[in-house]
Amino acid sequence: TLARRFSGGGAVYHDRGNINLSFIETVKQPDFVYYLQQVVDFLEKAGISAYADQRLGIYVDERKISGSAQCIHKDRVMYHCTLLFSTDLDTLNAALNGDPDAESRLPGSRTMRAVPSVRSEVANIKEFLSEPMDIKRFMHLLFHSFVDDDDNRIYRFSAGDMEAIER
């Protein structure tokens, strides 16, 4: 799936090898670099030497492994990013580069005009891991790295929350 986020940023390609991560918080003064740095720090703990650019993308060896977008609504801030773990990069590139043969790889796709994305060479995180790992294990480690941080907490939706979401 190829989508554009309402929160900005470039086009986003989704498949089962792509991890989506969001931070939502109530703050007076958002610090998007703080959220970005948490992801970079996790990757460092996983043995991946990653770095961020001024557009809040994350790179390894000059290849992009994560893009992000941010938005503010009233006193709520949302930072979200994609992590390319084991994405089909051929299909991703065909979709994002407007390959005329993308329709055969992406049934139901269609062309549309939008603000162009900033192009970057991409890579999968799994290429940089010192030991093989599947996406479920990686997500487990990622989740626990945030949960174990005292600054972060889990919010569990109540039945009332779920009803409001469904409306």
Residue ranges and their predicted role:
Residues T1-P30:
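N-terminal lobe of the biotin/lipoate ligase/transferase fold
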Residues L21, L56, C81-L83:
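A structural signal for short, well-ordered beta-strand segments
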Residues Q37-S49, S66-S68, H73-R167:
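Long, positively charged amphipathic alpha-helical accessory segments at protein N-termini or as interdomain linkers
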Residues S49-Y59:
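A short glycine-rich, hydrophobically flanked beta-strand micro-motif that places a catalytic Asp/Glu
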